[in-house]
A protein has these predicted regions:
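Intrinsic structural disorder
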Residues: 1-12, 80, 178, 245
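N-terminal auxiliary segments of SAM/dcSAM-dependent transferases
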Residues: 2-36
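Short, flexible helical or helix-coil boundary motifs
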Residues: 19-26, 30, 39, 46-47, ...
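Class I SAM-dependent transferase core
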Residues: 37-63
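S-adenosylmethionine/decaboxylated-SAM
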Residues: 55-59, 66-264
Length: 264
């Protein structure tokens, strides 16, 4: 259902067209893009730990605020009824995604709602949060690796329980190229035409260090390189990188990390 048609107007349409024009200018504004990169370096992983300063509904989100804003836009436009997050941490992401789907459900834009989490370690304090937080009580979490068969079966079973599923995947677990590429290979086939996969922390490729976390990942071995490899596969050729999202954000932890399934 395109709810935008209910309240659309020539003025709103014109405003959205202007957004597209502004994004194009920002994308081609070398100085703006360079300032964004420099700011990320100052705020990044090993400097101020800036992303650790924000909460969603009282839970650490560990996200740049503008990245959350653009995810809200993706969710509103795509209207998924299943969201799967790989890498749970504190659970702030799960709270965010479930609250967004609760809004869609309340607005009668979706009739079913599921939010799933997968993490190699489902920590006790996170379990307590998810059990008691009003946005998280019906969230389901699987403890294990996102690329194990058991995790895949967990995702498949839950997706198949939804009528006409429209899953949105958020990959934010282990950030090595091989791991993320395997996640993409496993879960991309579930995504319908026009659907999205959000690959977090692609900024590691451009702002990370070769010895980060004991060289478990870094430039040349990152979520961004995983996307490049995946896009060369038969399944990957069905997707495109949503470059306009990176351009509009300027400051982002997921440059080139949003991929969209093409309509055939």
């Amino acid at each position: 259902m395109d709810i935008d048609q209910k309240y659309n107007s020539p003025e709103l349409g014109s405003f959205k067209e202007q957004i597209t024009q502004r994004i194009s200018k920002i994308k081609n504004h070398a100085e703006v893009q360079e300032v964004g990169k420099r700011l990320f370096d100052l705020l990044g992983y090993d400097q101020t730990m800036y992303v650790y300063n924000f909460l969603w509904a009282g839970i650490p989100s560990i996200q740049l605020p503008q990245d959350l804003m653009v995810k809200q836009e993706i969710i509103w436009d795509y209207q998924p009824n299943v969201i799967i997050e790989m890498g749970v941490a504190w659970g702030g992401g799960l709270a965010f995604y479930n609250s967004m789907l609760m809004l869609l459900e309340q607005s009668e834009l979706i009739t079913q709602r599921k939010v799933l989490g997968i993490d190699i370690e489902f920590r006790e304090h996170t379990q307590k949060i998810l059990k008691n937080h009003p946005f998280c009580k019906d969230v389901r979490v699987f403890e294990g690796s996102s690329i194990d068969l058991e995790a895949y079966d967990f995702v498949k079973t839950n997706i198949n329980e939804v009528d006409e599923p429209r899953p949105l995947f958020v990959l934010d677990s282990f950030h090595s190229m091989d791991h993320v590429k395997r996640e993409l290979e496993l879960y991309a086939p579930f995504v319908p035409e026009g659907g999205y996969i959000i690959v977090e922390d692609t900024a590691i490729e451009f702002h990370g260090k070769a010895d980060h976390k004991g060289a478990r990942w870094g430039p040349g071995n990152s979520p961004w390189t995983a996307i490049q490899k995946f896009m060369q596969t038969d399944e990957g050729e069905l997707f495109e990188v949503a470059d306009e999202i990176t351009a509009k954000l300027v400051l982002t932890g997921m440059p080139g990390g949003v991929i969209r399934k093409l309509k055939q």
